[in-house]
């Protein structure tokens, strides 16, 4: 694998096949064993990877088929974190998710054989004889775990009981994450993407007004905290490990959680986060314009999420090319790439598309990119 710019990509989660959905439900109802569920997961992941390769993707994922949520499953794999059921799920535009959370149960630390490492090991095995593709592992950003631990009054109370000194909390989260990243590396992973909704909350005035009510943070102060959490996990990593981040505004059942352009956070996250590339949502008016890209340091990559994963309708190819041209005013064209705005299934429910729609979106990404970057 090289760090050469690849001009087409996906965010990585894919619609769960009905066979997998049925098996997960049967497992929850104690009708099948965990071993049987794992066999179904393995089979459907193998089918997905073959499909990704057939479509022409050069970076493949397991579709997050072993996860229920894009973020919580990773949190639950750390020591000192437990799975809890809050009163409410996450609130999206016109919809509420299932109610699950992660709370502190002790000192947060990394535990060997983390579920994400197990998942990646199987993915790596599937492509071991194919030098033409790279296996990627997506994990939620360290800052996302911090936010979850202060998600509501219940979580805040428990977190403060275990961690009255928040500096120790920040240090433990970053350390646990760095050890996860290094363990993934030691198992052959050379491409890790941090999925991160924390910045999307800061840019949304409605979210920010609620979040800032306790007066503990200014917008700049919170951004400094998120950078410390994320960059703290990314220190002294191997040179041949590619680290990227996807900045998201929520993606559940084709709905969204937050809105706002990147301007309020661009000078922090674009200029200072220690990643190789930013996967950014620009699929509708909620995302604002490309002007904040002026803060991206020269040489870093930006993957333009201008093809929505929330709706089946296909974008006009010429309009996509024009938008790429507009973005190139702020980032060199050779450092730009194209992808869908988010994954197709950030949770196991998935967005309101068919697998055929999903495939058509990916084909549009690849075809458009090949015409732009000839």
Residue ranges, per PLM feature:
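Domain-level signal for soluble alpha/beta catalytic cores
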Residues: 1-374
């Amino acid at each position: 694998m090289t760090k050469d710019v690849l001009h087409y990509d996906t965010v990585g989660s894919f619609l769960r096949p009905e066979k997998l959905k049925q098996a997960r439900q049967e497992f929850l109802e104690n009708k099948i064993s965990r071993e049987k569920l794992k066999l179904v997961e393995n089979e459907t992941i193998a089918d997905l990877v073959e499909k990704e390769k057939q479509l022409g993707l050069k970076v493949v994922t397991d579709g997050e088929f072993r996860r229920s949520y894009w973020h919580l499953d990773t949190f639950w794999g750390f020591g000192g974190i437990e799975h809890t059921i809050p009163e409410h799920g996450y609130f999206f535009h016109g919809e509420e998710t299932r109610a699950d959370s992660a709370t502190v149960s002790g000192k947060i630390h990394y535990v060997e054989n983390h579920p994400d490492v197990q998942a990646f090991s199987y993915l790596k095995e599937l492509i071991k004889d194919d030098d033409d593709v790279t296996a990627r592992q997506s994990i939620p950003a360290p800052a996302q775990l911090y936010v979850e631990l202060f998600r509501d009054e219940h979580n805040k109370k428990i977190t403060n009981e275990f961690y009255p000194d928040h500096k120790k909390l920040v240090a433990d989260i970053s350390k646990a994450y760095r050890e996860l990243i290094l363990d993934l590396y030691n198992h052959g992973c050379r491409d890790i993407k941090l999925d991160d909704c924390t910045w999307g909350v800061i840019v949304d005035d409605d979210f920010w007004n609620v979040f800032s009510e306790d007066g503990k943070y200014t917008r700049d102060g919170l951004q400094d905290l998120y950078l410390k959490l994320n960059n703290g996990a990314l220190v002294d990593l191997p040179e041949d490990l590619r680290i990227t981040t996807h900045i998201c505004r929520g993606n559940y059942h084709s709905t969204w959680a937050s809105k706002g352009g990147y301007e309020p956070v661009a000078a922090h996250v674009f200029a200072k986060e220690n990643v190789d590339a930013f996967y950014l949502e620009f699929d509708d008016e909620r995302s604002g314009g490309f002007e904040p890209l002026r803060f991206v340091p020269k040489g870093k990559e930006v993957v333009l999420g201008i093809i929505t994963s929330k709706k089946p309708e296909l974008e006009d190819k010429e309009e996509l090319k024009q938008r790429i041209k507009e973005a190139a005013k702020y980032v060199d064209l050779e450092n730009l790439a194209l992808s869908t705005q988010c994954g197709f299934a950030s949770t196991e429910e998935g967005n309101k598309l068919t697998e055929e729609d999903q495939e058509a979106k990916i084909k549009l990404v690849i075809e458009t990119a090949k015409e732009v970057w000839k």
